Amino acid sequence: VGVCCGYKLCHPC
């Protein structure tokens, strides 16, 4: 559980 930030996107995971 946390935050995944990739190519110009952030979402909970």
UniProtKB/Swiss-Prot annotation:
Protein name: Chi-conotoxin MrIB
GO CC terms: extracellular region
Family recorded in the similarity comment: Belongs to the conotoxin T superfamily.
Taxonomic classification: Eukaryota, Metazoa, Spiralia, Lophotrochozoa, Mollusca
UniProt subcellular location: Secreted
Modified residues (4-hydroxyproline): 12
Main location: secreted
Further facts: Exists in two forms, due to cis-trans isomerization at 11-His-Hyp-12.
Alphabetized UniProt keyword annotations: Disulfide bond, Hydroxylation, Neurotoxin, Secreted, Toxin
Function: Chi-conotoxins inhibit the neuronal noradrenaline transporter (NET/SLC6A2).
One Gene Ontology term of the molecular function aspect: toxin activity
Cysteine disulfide partners in this protein: 4-13, 5-10
Tissue specificity comment: Expressed by the venom duct.
